[in-house]
A protein has these predicted regions:
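Paired acidic/hydrophobic, glycine-rich loop segments that form the ligand-binding mouth/hinge
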Residues: 96-99, 270-275, 294
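Conserved N-terminal structural module of periplasmic/extracytoplasmic solute-binding proteins
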Residues: 2-106, 287, 302-303, 324-325, ...
Length: 354
């Protein structure tokens, strides 16, 4: 498949695709009522599916007694984005801060729905984060979010299941060895992993194979996507299709569903190839596996020590005319994403983005 379009067209198409159930009209700013409570405190609302973020609230409020923070889980990625789009379209009900993955951030920036945090001094943090995460939030000369986490890939596995199968994942380096390990795990009744058609996972694995199906024209504007003629894309597709054909991957259990968590919990799905942010999700979604999970390097096509990324997200501020709420929201974002104590509290069980 080959497709060529301008960057602007791609951004607009992507933005339109995210406008599920959103009316065609409405304000792009958050017109919620003043956030000042009866006690004179400024109240801010944060939407985030990150289970570690609420841990930071108590210490933040202690250090900032004039601010009250309410963290709400409005759903994971696309579920949250739909709710956010609906609120933005209606002109009310949007949060002050919202967790947005790096891939989705440009869509909200293009539509003018999030604040440039440079006005609060966020630009000075350019050397604090890894280059990749900083580049993901620095758009069109502005800083439109603060990085929360990053997603270098890792192989998380249930040691009990792999011990039963007689497989040591730390010695599995190539995709051929991964295939052999999958057969042994399947013989125990479990699947080595699951994949119900995750496009993000597909991207991550093709990048791991060395694929570069996306290219920018000499004009700096046109973008070409060519999947069918990239040999490295074929390397992954052929390998993964063989795994599926041989019933070595659970393709029926949807990722992030209750059944998926149940399968991780009981060992039916024995491992995951995913972002380094996964540990705290395992702790909350598969509590019976506590103490059983381990991590190994990603197996690669030829065993070389290369890696890819999967996911990663940021805290962005929804456009607002309320200066007090904006300043309070930025203080919390900086505390959670930059302050040493805030980061220490959040990254227990994860990998920071610096």
């Amino acid at each position: 498949m080959k497709f060529t379009a301008s960057k602007k067209t791609i951004a607009l198409v992507a933005a339109a695709a995210m406008l599920t159930s959103v009316a065609a009209c409405g304000s792009s700013s958050n017109s919620s009522s003043s956030g000042v409570t009866e006690g004179g405190k400024t109240e801010i609302t944060v939407w985030s599916w990150d289970s570690t973020l609420p841990r930071t609230v108590k210490d933040f409020e202690k250090a900032n007694p004039d601010i009250t923070v309410k963290v709400t889980n409005a759903g994971t990625n696309k579920t949250e984005y739909t709710a956010l789009n609906n609120a933005l379209s209606a002109g009310k009900g949007a949060p002050d801060l919202v967790q947005i993955e790096y891939y989705a951030l440009p869509e909200y920036q293009v539509r003018g729905e999030i604040e440039d945090l440079s006005q609060f001094g966020a630009g000075k943090f350019s050397d604090f984060y890894t280059p990749g995460t900083w580049a993901s939030v620095k758009l069109n000369g502005g800083v439109y979010a603060l990085p929360m986490d990053s997603g270098p890939m890792a192989w998380f596995y249930n040691k009990d299941v792999f011990d039963k199968a007689g497989v040591d994942p730390t010695r599995v380096r190539t995709w051929d060895e991964f295939y052999d390990a999958a057969k042994k795990v399947r013989a125990t009744g479990s699947y080595i992993t699951s994949d119900s058609g995750d496009a993000g996972f597909f991207d991550s694995m093709t990048w791991l194979a060395g694929a570069t199906p996306f290219s920018t024209g000499s004009d700096g504007q046109s973008v070409t996507i060519n999947l069918s003629n990239d040999s490295k894309v074929k390397t992954f597709v052929d390998f993964w299709q063989k795994m599926i054909d041989d019933d070595l991957i659970d393709t029926k259990t949807a990722g992030w569903s209750d059944d998926w968590n149940k399968s991780l919990n009981d060992g039916s799905i024995a491992s995951l190839l995913t972002g380094a942010w996964m540990p705290y999700n395992l702790l909350s979604g598969a509590p019976d596996g506590e103490g059983k999970w381990r991590v190994a390097q990603m197996p690669t096509p030829d065993g070389s020590e290369t890696n890819s990324e999967n996911g990663g997200s940021s805290l962005a501020m929804v456009k607002t005319d309320d200066k007090a709420k904006a300043e309070a929201a930025y203080k919390f974002a900086e505390y959670a994403c930059h302050n040493a104590e805030g980061i220490k509290t959040r990254v227990a069980g994860g990998i920071p983005c610096r």
